[in-house]
Each structure stands twice: as structure tokens, then as C-alpha cells.
Amino acid sequence: MEGFSGLFAASEPSSIPSAPGPPSVVPTCTGAFVSGKTQTSTPTVPGPPLPIPPPLSSSSSGEDSSRRPAAGPFYILRELPGLSDLTGSVNLILHYNLEHSFSKFCGKKMKEKLSNFLPDLPGMIDTPGAQDNSSLRSLIEKPPICGNSFTPLTGALLTGFRLHTGPLPEQCRLMHIQPPKKKNKKHKQSRTQEPAPPETPSDSDHRKKKKKQREDDPERRRKKKDKKKKKSRHSPEHPGAGSSQSGLR
């Protein structure tokens, strides 16, 4: 037994890795005590398996590729849309086969020219701008060469700025003339009062007649004269007023 225990004791420390630290007694399965070193090990707990990302498909085309969300962490981003044949440079009339409708409604020749509707517009507006290089496209592609010096305008260009001499039209003659304002010296009536009814010619004649009769009355004239005499006596300018005052003193 001692031989077997010695064999087991010799084989056990060899399997344990050596680590720095104080020696300790390790019990064996046979009950023999051998000198060895302690071993510290932390148990590892297995966690949940990580999700496997979906495989990227190499073939993506059309609307499915534009609507399918991108795989991976950049899920907000979307793939670029495919190239479209319909751009701003495409002629929509030819694209939608509307040549017949365009020629039907827009290709009719009018009997009257454009100058009949715009007589005051200078220049030859009946001819297209491509003939005399006055169109907007020709001005953009081939801008006119201008020097540093100013050249006077031609007679055709001056017609747009020229004022035609002649009398003013009737509707514009009295625009700058303001009518004279009547001065109203009468007292303004209050807004609460009702407006007086208009006077008839018979009422005005009756008032004038009554006023004339009052002026022709002899007693009325005599009373007026007496009032004037009394006023003149009491006034300081009257010559008799000073003598009467001195006599009283």
C-alpha cells in the first residue's frame, strides 16, 4: 500500500500546474497527504449565442433593391435608386406620343398677325427670333460683343422710349385740376339732431317779405334812433359827455 500511495502522490503534483504562492497540503483519493500548491480557477458560464447576420444577396435589381433595407448596423440607409430614362432633357411630347394633339391645337395658323394685337411694341415681332438672332437662346449661346464705349440707340430702339406729342385725351385733362372747396361758415349741427328739412321757395319768399315789412315800420325806426342817441351820449367820444361830468363836480 505504501508503494501504491507513493506512486499516486508522485503522479498528482505533476498534473497540477505550478503557481507562485505558499505550499499547501492537497488530499489525494487514496487518503495520503502530499505537499503541493493551491490552484485558483474562475468558472466560465456560457452565454447566449450571437445572432448570425442575414446573408447579403449579390443579385439586387429594380424596385425590390430600392425598397429592401440594408443589412447590418446601417439599417436606416437605403440603396440608391436605379437610373430612370425620364429626365429633364426628354421631350415629353414624343415620350407620351402627343405629336398629333400638339399639331392639332398649337399648329393652326392665325389670320391676324401678332403685331395687330400689340401695335405699340417696337421691332419686328411677327418674324421668329431665330431669323434675326434675337431669341433668348441665341443671346445665351452667342452673347453680343460689346465694347467699352457706349453707342447711341438706333431709331427702331428709340421708339419704345419716345413720347408722342399731341393733346391730352379727354379723360386725362381734368385729372390735375382740383375743384375749389366751399367754406362752410355755418355752425355744425350735432350728430344727434335730425337734419332740417329743405326750404321751399314759398317759405323763403315769405321770410323776405316779413323782414321787409319790419324795416318799413315807422315805430321800429324811431326806437332804433333813440337807442343810437343814448349810446352816443354815454360814449366818451361824445363832446357833451365831458361838460356834463364837469358840471356835476
Swiss-Prot record:
GO molecular function (one): transcription coregulator activity
InterPro entries: Mediator_Med19_met
One annotated GO biological process: regulation of transcription by RNA polymerase II
Keyword field: Activator, Nucleus, Transcription, Transcription regulation
Coiled-coil region(s): none
Residue stretches of biased makeup (Basic residues): 179-190, 221-233
Membrane keyword on record: no
Location in the cell: Nucleus
Chief location bin: nucleus
Pro residues bias (residue ranges): 45-56
Cellular component aspect of the GO annotation: mediator complex
Family annotation (PANTHER family): LUNG CANCER METASTASIS-RELATED LCMR1 PROTEIN, MEDIATOR OF RNA POLYMERASE II TRANSCRIPTION SUBUNIT 19
Source organism of this protein record: Xenopus tropicalis
Protein name per UniProt: Mediator of RNA polymerase II transcription subunit 19
Disulphide-bonded residues: none
Stretch list, region Disordered: 1-68, 178-249
Residue spans of biased composition, Low complexity class: 9-18
Tree of life domain: Eukaryota
Purpose: Component of the Mediator complex, a coactivator involved in the regulated transcription of nearly all RNA polymerase II-dependent genes. Mediator functions as a bridge to convey information from gene-specific regulatory proteins to the basal RNA polymerase II transcription machinery. Mediator is recruited to promoters by direct interactions with regulatory proteins and serves as a scaffold for the assembly of a functional preinitiation complex with RNA polymerase II and the general transcription factors.
Keyword Transcription: yes
Subunit structure: Component of the Mediator complex.
Family, per entry: Belongs to the Mediator complex subunit 19 family.
